[in-house]
Amino acid sequence: MRGLSAVVRVLCVAALAVGVFAAAVLLAGTAGNAKAAGYESLMVPSNAMGRDIPVAFMAGGPHAVYLLDAFNAALDVSNWVTAGNAMTTLGGRGISVVAPAGGAYSMYTNWENDGSKQWDTFLSSELPDWLATKRGLAPDGHAAVGASQGGYAALALAAFHPDRFGFAGSLSGFVYPSSTNYNGAILAGLQQFGGIDGNGMWGAPQLGRWKWHDPYVHASLLAQNNTRVWVYSPMTMGGDIDAMIGQAVASMGSSREFYQQYRSVGGHNGHFDFSGGGDNGWGAWAPQLAAMSGDIVGAIR
């Protein structure tokens, strides 16, 4: 993997300035099918995907953190709710929590050749608009945090929809997908673990459209908008193989290359953790969510 060994040697934990948004008025209580930790199990319609999407929702304030699952995302309840313990971690912090399910092997993007995978439209438009209408949330000013494929999506959503998302957290994310060092790994993992031809996403990588969707290529947007960024990628390939589609090395390399790119374009509002502790799995991702919770609250509440 050309150039990867040099990149992986980059060890840094950079914590940079964080902007604090004005405090917001708390939401009144919401009605619904309450479950553990006080969250609701919603079915949110998606015209783009032609079906209703299961969403775990916990009311806490007008701004929310959207939690995006790994490649082996659960069908009905997000792994953030179960393995990630997110509702307990974020409860009582003055923010709402939004955790969609059913996005396995999708990268949470709009697929060119699969109408059932139009996740960017759902996450950036349909879901926030529905929550604004039905649950009284603010239409804009939210956070996106994801693990594995969700880490890619969190940075992409914040880069391309800055009004919607002012905070992006990537945990073991695949954040430079257009690189020839990594796109083959993503395609191989999608085929092996999901039985899916990833060329249906943005076409074959050599056609060039992968760059249109790449947060590495568009890191300047995150820098220009002063988006708060949190990136975690441990110095190990261990962890949840299924969640990482067996390609942890691509996550490691791309996260470190993203750091270099982000700094080169003037980014200065990021926290990057490339330490030796932890792994690429829920045993590390859940504590990372707790560690970044103060940053999330400071950025969106």
From Swiss-Prot:
InterPro entries: AB_hydrolase_fold (IPR029058), Esterase-like (IPR000801), Mycobacterial_A85_antigen (IPR050583)
Name by which UniProt lists this protein: MPT51 antigen
UniProt function note: May have a role in host tissue attachment, whereby ligands may include the serum protein fibronectin and small sugars.
Listed GO CC annotations: extracellular region
Keywords: Acyltransferase, Secreted, Signal, Transferase
Originating organism: Mycobacterium leprae (strain TN)
Record note on quaternary structure: Homodimer.
Presence of the UniProt keyword Cytoplasm in the record: no
Pfam family, one: Esterase
